[in-house]
């Protein structure tokens, strides 16, 4: 495939609590060394995690930055071809240089809705550490990233036309579109203010494929017992909690809905 989905980033106030959750439950491993802490200092104990394909960055949330899902990342065979397609079909889309400390990508861009993502190509100068490796297979891995959009068909066309992602047969419908790199999927689901007032456009959730859903649920329970601070959180609480959960469960790739210790929405399937 021309494009591979390779990166997801979250802003968090507690890197280590979140890292424990993703390492313990999903077997993710550290692939980079060193990230900024809450005081702006370099902490060599922090680093991006990986499931063997997708790098997960648990970034320190600083003042003025919202917690939760922030961006994702694509690796392409030819960045110049992407630039040419953007210039031809989406001239209003901006491409910027990444900051030098970013280990995954040399560029940052966005889709027509403004959802930002990193853009990488093998051989870029600042792609380093674990992102240079071939990776590995493991039984629990990130299989999709979900976006909410008021114009999902337009967004799906963008990811197909520019990045050559392909529709997933049998999944699209009811205003939702699922496009894939052959392994990982971008789910583009409708946004509106009818479902519930707090439903926001933009990055919505991401999900894991696991070897056995019941085994994963048992591991969730064990984590809650052994390390309560890193336990998953219930979604169906508060005024709109049940609506949020039902809305997440409507994702075609969801068999079990949950939230991580920070409240980032996740789903599991097997």
Features from the language model and the residues they span:
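Exposed loop/turn and edge beta-strand positions of beta-sandwich/beta-sheet ligand-binding modules
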Residues: 4, 43, 52, 68, ...
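Vicinal oxygen chelate
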Residues: 87-141, 170, 178, 221-270
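N-terminal beta-strand motif that seeds the catalytic metal site of vicinal oxygen chelate
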Residues: 1-19, 69-72, 122-156, 166, ...
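Short amphipathic alpha-helices within nucleic acid-binding modules
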Residues: 80-85, 213-220
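Short, charged/polar, Gly/Pro-enriched secondary-structure boundary elements
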Residues: 54-57, 66, 114-117, 183-187, ...
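Core segments of cupin and vicinal oxygen chelate
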Residues: 1-2, 9-55, 146-187, 191, ...
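Residue-level structural signal for beta-strand termini and adjacent loop
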Residues: 36, 61, 120-122, 173, ...
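Fold-core signature of tandem repeat domains
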Residues: 5, 49, 76, 119, ...
